Amino acid sequence: MLDRKEILSIEDIKLLVDTFYEKVRKDALIGPIFEDKIQDRWPEHLERMYRFWQTVLLEEHTYFGSPFPPHAQLPVVWEHFERWLSLFNSNIDDQFSGKIAEEAKWRANKMAEMFYYKIRHYRNTDARPLF
């Protein structure tokens, strides 16, 4: 078993993001959705995710933007979010411990719930996200 450490730096965030997306890309259920959307722009996506989680978890404000709009039209149902959460949480649990690791899992869960409900809303109306 690996020694689990706290999430304290951008290096920890990069480890979290890189290992998580390695699992996502290999996953039979959600991997194809990510590959179709991101295509050859993985370096840019990973950099954006570093900044997002650095802002959320370390309170170092390097991410500016709206995370939801790129997800608004994805062909996903709750099962996809469950898999995303399962991969994210197990990735955290395999490598990290402590308050920030628990906060990362809590925030990921809240984000998945919010994205799921917003995606359902936009599927059932003619409205589109503002940002």
What are these regions (language model features)?
Residues M1-F131:
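Core of compact, soluble alpha-helical bundle domains
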